[in-house]
Amino acid sequence: AELKAAGQKNLDANLETLHEACAEFAPGESTQACVAKVTANKPEGGEVAGARAQQPMLKQIVIDNNIASIPGPEHALVDEAPPHRRFNFAYINIPGPFETGMPSTYFIAPPDPEWSEEDQLAYIPGEADLLAVSVHEVWPGHFLQYLHSNRTQNNVGQHFGTYTFSEGWAHYTEQMMVDAGLGDGDPEVRIGQLLNALLRNVRYMSAIGLHTEGMTVEESQKMFEEKAFQDFGNASQQAYRGTYDPGYLNYTLGKLMINKLRDDWTEGRGGREAWGKFHDQFLSYGVPPIPLIREQMLGEDYDGDGAILPN
């Protein structure tokens, strides 16, 4: 019940923020029409070319805004996902900790050619939506986290990982980057970030519903369409994924845990100015469970309420 309540609270908050951003971006229009307007602004040259073009700018923002240190010269490639790995729109393939000289590749899946032309076009995200995906997968999401974890002195944290940490961190960076200046206050960029947040919110609620409350796949798909504003293709993919991956609630769960830890750790250490130091220390442990990192970072002297999720 506590897990579900935390997820519902964050879903409601993100919906409210989306309504506010849409009122600025498309005054007088419905939220649905606002989202359609954002989605219609497709990346120039297609989704792969668009994602590739976003990488230098995102890396520079990480550097200029002191988001986190970049501990190595590696960069991620961007390519179309192979046919056997198109069950999700995007993912990054990162070499294991014992590999050397192998590149990381950010893969993007094209729409299913068997879908209608309308559904294929709707599947391709808008520029702002894709920007949040690129943040998640590369800078400063999974790829930057990999650069740190492969250099950690913590062998256990380097060789073993947790779903909540890896996906929680990558999802956390989407909102954090916008809060830190990505988009310079452009409501379209905020809407793109919120669409990704709502997608993860509905994953969270679907995981609980499908596996503990008798929710059907059709009901999950409807929730993705109505609460996360997903097109048919993405909604059907996401609902189906929930049947075999109940752990996909860890995107939102991990993000909420990191937000709580960041707020607790930076209080008295400079607040927003300490985000870079927080991120470097957080990433220095490898990929262990977030509650263990919380113990290490806050120490025995921390006199907070003991909660690991925001109130």
Cite the ranges covered by each PLM segment.
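Long, His/Glu/Asp-enriched segments that create or flank divalent metal/ion-associated functional microenvironments
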Residues: K9-E16, C34-N311
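Structured, charged N-terminal subsegments at the starts of enzyme catalytic cores
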Residues: A1-Q32
